[in-house]
Amino acid sequence: MLRIMKYLSKTEIGQLLISLVTIVGQVYFDLELPSYMSEITRLVETPEIQMRDIWISGGKMLLVSFGSLVCAVITGYFAARVAASFGQRLRSLEFRKVESFGPSEMHRFSTASLITRSTNDVTQIQMFITMGLQMLIKSPIMAVWAVCKIAGEGFEWTLTTGIAVVVLLCAVGILMALVMPKFKAMQRLTDDINLVARENLTGMRVVRAYNAQDYQESKFEDANAALTNTQLFTNRAMSVMMPLMSTIMNGLSLAIYWIGAYLIEDAGATEKLTLFSNMIVFSSYAVQVIMSFLLMSMVFVLWPRADVSAHRVMEVINTEPLVKSGTRSRGLTVAEAKQAGVITAADAADYRDDLELAGRIEFRDVSFTYPDSREAMLEGISFTADQGDTVAIIGSTGSGKSSLINLVPRFYDASAGAVLVDGVDVRDYDLKALRDKIGYVPQQSFLFKGTVKSNVSYGDRPGEPEDVPMLDASRASGRKAEREMLKADENRALTAQEENRVEQACDVAQATEFVEKMRGAFDAAIAQGGTNVSGGQRQRLSIARAVYRNPEILIFDDSFSALDFKTDRVVRDALKAYAKDATKIIVAQRVGTIMDADCILVLDDGRLVGKGTHRELLESCDVYRQIAQSQLSEEELSA
């Protein structure tokens, strides 16, 4: 828990120091009250006392109480500010860290767990700062101060108070030993229930299609019951604490009065009033001592959950992704590439030496093994794609097609060999610079909540800051925060040129026809995940998004599978015309999609078993020939 406090800002530390001062002030005022109570008791018992003196002492008590109230309000105000801004910072740190994660890190944590860590766990930390931190600071100060006040006032009373404190600490220790292991289990079980709920909501259509509602309900009930039983155990254990604290506190007061009664009975007439006054004061201070330990016990209730949550949050923040960004921001120039032997002098003859290579991809004896696997997914892959080339990849399911193209944008790094883009090893590139060169269309098309326009133009833009300033959570909330977010969206409004590029990209992807039929056309609303459009429409918008970037390299991971043959052909022809200078890598299952490619790579069990044009592979590669014969007619094969 203490490690996460290093993320507090200087302003927040200053606010906590102010809270510390006001807590000390509050303790001082609280411990002054028994003194005035003793004085009023003495005045009441004193003959010939003036009522005015009692009113003065009572007025001082009211002022002291008001001072305590003011200090408590100031402490609560600054604690709430610190908790809100600190929680915001932790969520932002987690989000930005998760954005740097690759598939291996996502697999390690799981999406459901990451959501829980950035919401529920951060809330637990905020709750501790708002309430627990005050108690953690206040309780020891109050305990020490109150003990100093009562030291030497009476051996019997002091011994009784000490016994009560020991009993209290033993009870709290036993309870904490019982419940602390359960708090970590509760966070894990919360992850599980979020996972089941998210899986059910995401796969709702499949659940209904297979009439698996009862099965899903059973899975949810199992997870829900496990979480509920754990919560019941901790709640039952913690429910003993408050009655136990009250019993100890009331028992101590009773013991003090009982001992005081015997002391007063045996005292002389002149000492009775002094003993009675001391008993009242001692009782009040003893209750303050018990209250301080009671507050400390409340800290023990909040601390375990916050500590577990802080550990889980720090686990995310401190996780270093396997794929680390390099420093290079550009590829080689023609002169550099010629000197490095990346291209030959004949290839460089038609270009100026100061021009940069663009869209050139080279795999040099690349092998790849997934982090948690022992078997290689790819072995000894070598090929080159020059600017403007169309390279297709085909093979059976599980042959490594998607794994191969995932190495280009560095979703994973090669286990052996090297992947070069524009003559530079991709591991040397700054990740942002590398991915700015690439337009990527994933196998499972995904659209974001927004509009057609915002989805097609998705991504960063030249001149925009990489780190967007965070909204100040301590100053903006509710509708004000919503207005700030809307204002930020308005500031990202497309220029006329960008809107024209959106329309061009949709034309290339053959999406304009259905987009214009939607309400609002390019401003039509898109639901999260693109659930309000068909699979083919999602794919076309995903293709448009990649084309909009005007990248050096276009990667299509089986991105034409949801298109009919006619649309598939039209889209590929449009891409050939519009993005003729871009290098295109196409993963496909349909031979008809890749027949016109400049080079076709045939993968089988992670190995490159064929490389050439469609006609060449029909003659030289058995695997390709079998795939083609299973899909094409005799006339198409002989054409």
Describe the predicted segments one by one.
Residues 10-74, 78, 151-156, 265-276:
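Transmembrane helix-loop-helix hairpins at lipid-water interfaces of multipass membrane proteins
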Residues 23, 65, 135, 139, ...:
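Residue-level recognition of pore/gate-forming positions within transmembrane alpha-helices
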Residues 1, 21-22, 29-42, 55, ...:
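Juxtamembrane helix-loop junctions of ABC transporter transmembrane domains
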Residues 50, 145, 149-166, 176, ...:
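Helix-loop-helix
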Residues 334-639:
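ABC-type nucleotide-binding domain
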